From Swiss-Prot:
Belongs to the methyltransferase superfamily. RsmH family. Specifically methylates the N4 position of cytidine in position 1402 (C1402) of 16S rRNA. The keyword Zinc does not apply. SUPFAM superfamilies: Putative methyltransferase TM0872, insert domain, S-adenosyl-L-methionine-dependent methyltransferases. One of its GO terms (biological process) is rRNA base methylation. Residues 289-311 are annotated as: Disordered. One of its GO terms (cellular component) is cytoplasm. This is Ribosomal RNA small subunit methyltransferase H. Its EC number is 2.1.1.199. It comes from Carboxydothermus hydrogenoformans (strain ATCC BAA-161 / DSM 6008 / Z-2901).
Amino acid sequence: MEFSHVPVLLNETIEHLNLKAGGVYVDATLGGGGHSEEILKRADCRVVGLDQDEDALNHAAKRLAPFGDRFIPVKSNFRNIRKVVYRLGLDAVDGVLMDLGVSSFQLDNPLKGFSFQHDGPLDMRMDPQNPKTAADVVNTYPEKELIRIFYEYGEERYAPQIARAIVKRREKKPFTSTLELAEEIIRAVPAKARREKHPAKRVFQAIRIEVNDELSSLEEGLVGAVEVLKPGGRIVVITFHSLEDRLVKNFFRREENPCICPKDFPMCVCGKKPRLKVITKKPLVPSEEEIEKNRRAHSAKLRAAEKLSFA
C-alpha cells in the first residue's frame, strides 16, 4: 500500500525545533516520514525515527534511505524514548517531535481497522503485537466500562445510549467489522446528532485510545522526552483532539511552574525547580490554506517548549 502522508504544520514544526548542524533529533511518531525528511533536508543533522507499526517504519525507512546513516529507524512506542536514546549510546538529544494520533497510512488502510468510513476488521492496534484489539473492547467490556471510555476518551454525550445499543446487539452476534459498529452507533444516537459530525467519530477515537493506551503512553513519553533533552533542546508536540492538547498543556505548565508551596509562603521551600520554558503561550494552528490542502490538519494544535539550562 502506498502512503499519501502530508505532514501537518511542517514549517512551524521546523521553526520551533530550532535545528542546528550536528544535532540529533527524535521523531517520536515517524508515520510517513514527512517531518523527518524535512528535518534532514534543512540541517546537517541526524534523526532517530520511532514507530510501533513495522509497516509504517519500513515505508518511512525506504523514503529516507537517501539520507544514509543520518536516519536511524527504531521500532518502539515513544513511551520508551529514554530506553531508545540510551540504547543508541546517546547521552542526550537536541529536539523531540511528537505528531500524535493516527497516521494517514493507518487511516487509509482498511485492514488496520481505524476508519469508520471503510470496512475492515475491528483492530485499531498501532502495534500489531499488542494483544488487545477493538473487537475485544467492543465485545467483552461491561456496559459501564464502555460508557466510561466513551465519555472520558471520546467526550461523547450519547455514551449511555451507544453503549447500551452495543451490548444489546453483541448478545445476538459479536461485532467483527468497523462498518458494523459504525452503523450500530448511527442507529443509537438521535436523528439531530446524525446531521453533525459522523456519529461514530468520537466513539472510534475512544476505542482507539483504550486499545493503544494512548494517554498513559503520552504522559510517559513527555516525561522521557524532557529527560533526554539537552539544555536548550526543544520539544514540539502536535495534537489532534482536546484530551491530548489538555494533557500536553498541563504537562508543560507543571514543568514551567512546578512549585507546590502554598501561595502565602514568602519563598519556595518545596525544592521543585522548573525544567521547561514554554515557547508557545497559545497553541499554533494550521492556516486556512493548509486546511484546504489537507482536511486532516483542521484540528491540529502545536505546542513547543525549551529545556532550561539549569534543569
